[in-house]
């Protein structure tokens, strides 16, 4: 890979040489760089442990279906200028025609949320429980079905009407057509084809399912997306959204971001936009990265890193530069954290303390198992957060089974 040495990075390197000579900064700074290509052509999956894990063309997809065991939504490619409009009841499918595009300016489009991957644009209007926004869970049939439809505006000016019809046994079903009803098609996306991944991508124009997410571990996705930069103001930005198993702590006001500040696991968050876009600013025709900020990142492997952005060229080249210091290595006996919607903190936990369990969908039942298969606790749950006590747990490994109407997930809990 080509390496980009900007004056800003050279200044960082010079200060780092001084810092490394001191006892407080004995660990090596690893510099890395990669490119999103001019115009941010590519989205880049990045592993803090090992570098670029994969790339994909940003414009190749329109929808990204959440294929995690308890996933139940779809994202739109808002970073490419795509918009999603609510269009009423599915029974009005034949009523929607080309006149919708003429009146779309009076309708507020739905947006992806940027706190969690489960906040797809199709989830707008949901209640976080049985109503997913696009569809409602049927407690009799145990399926999610929809009576809603949407209109999609694609970046090339094409308009489509679209309905995400159902999610049954891990299979999304949907239909799509031009506004005048031509080019109608139906298709499905099965979660089982994407085990261990977060998203299955889809191109509506080509009617093509795309497997773009790398098989190898990744921690950050550098991508063009839409962020609410202030209340009611949505704007296209370029930045990093994290893997759901990654946690991040942001530290500001540092004289030397490679040395100052300390990791505090209690200050870490699993919000996917914890790094986001605001580590840089634009002015005078160029970008400047913040020279007083670092991020402490706990990767999917459990390794803890100090991460500092050292350069960003903007859309002219798409080049990104950073430096990182390994604070604590991964436990090689532990497998990387899977892509789940449920999270435990702290983990590991000290015996006798409480553990907070959060889930991106509404939980219905929690079961704690010992590693030898003995049931330790059964907890009825309703909502997206619950506190579990470890008072009755001896030090060791446990399995926490989380159930919701979307499915089940199992998280490993270590009690020390």
Give each language-model segment a name.
Residues 11-19:
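Bacterial N-terminal signal peptides
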Residues 2-12:
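Bacterial N-terminal signal peptides that target proteins for export
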Residues 26-329:
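Surface-exposed, beta-sheet-biased, low-hydrophobicity segments with strongly acidic/polar composition
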């Amino acid at each position: 890979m080509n390496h980009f040495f900007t004056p800003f990075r050279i200044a960082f390197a010079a200060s780092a040489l001084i810092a490394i000579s001191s006892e407080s900064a004995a660990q090596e700074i690893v510099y890395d760089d990669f490119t999103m290509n001019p115009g941010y052509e590519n989205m880049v999956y990045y592993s803090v442990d090992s570098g670029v894990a994969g790339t994909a063309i940003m414009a190749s997809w329109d929808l990204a279906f959440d294929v995690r065991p308890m996933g139940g939504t779809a994202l739109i490619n808002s970073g490419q200028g795509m918009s999603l409009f609510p269009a009423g009841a599915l029974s009005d499918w034949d009523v929607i025609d080309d006149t919708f595009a003429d009146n779309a300016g009076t309708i507020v489009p739905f947006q992806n949320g940027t706190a969690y991957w489960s906040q797809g644009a199709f989830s707008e209007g949901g209640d976080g429980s049985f109503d997913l926004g696009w569809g409602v869970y049927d407690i009799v049939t145990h399926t999610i079905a929809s009576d809603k439809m949407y209109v999609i505006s694609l970046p090339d000016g094409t308009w489509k009407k679209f309905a995400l019809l159902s999610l049954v046994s891990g299979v999304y079903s949907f239909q799509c057509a031009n506004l005048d009803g031509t080019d109608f098609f139906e298709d499905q996306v099965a979660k089982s084809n994407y085990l261990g991944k977060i998203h299955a991508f889809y191109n509506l124009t080509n009617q093509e399912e795309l497997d773009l997410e790398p098989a190898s571990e990744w921690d950050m996705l550098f991508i063009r997306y839409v962020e609410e930069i202030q209340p009611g103001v949505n704007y296209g930005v370029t930045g990093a959204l994290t893997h759901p198993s990654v946690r991040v702590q942001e530290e500001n006001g540092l004289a030397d971001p490679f040395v100052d500040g300390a990791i505090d696991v209690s200050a870490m968050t699993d919000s996917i936009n914890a790094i986001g876009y605001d580590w840089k600013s634009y002015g005078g025709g160029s970008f400047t990265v913040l020279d007083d900020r670092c991020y402490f990142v706990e990767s999917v492997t459990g390794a803890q890193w100090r991460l500092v952005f050292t350069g960003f060229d903007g859309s002219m080249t798409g080049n990104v530069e950073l430096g990182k210091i390994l604070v604590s290595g991964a436990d090689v006996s532990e497998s990387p954290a899977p892509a789940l919607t449920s999270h435990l903190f702290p983990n590991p936990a000290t015996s006798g303390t409480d553990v907070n369990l959060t889930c991106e969908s509404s939980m219905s039942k929690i079961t704690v198992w010992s590693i030898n298969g003995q049931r330790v606790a059964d907890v009825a749950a309703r909502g997206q957060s619950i506190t579990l006590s470890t008072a009755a747990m001896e030090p060791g490994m446990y399995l926490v089974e989380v159930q919701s109407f979307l499915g089940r997930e199992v998280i490993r809990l270590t009690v020390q």
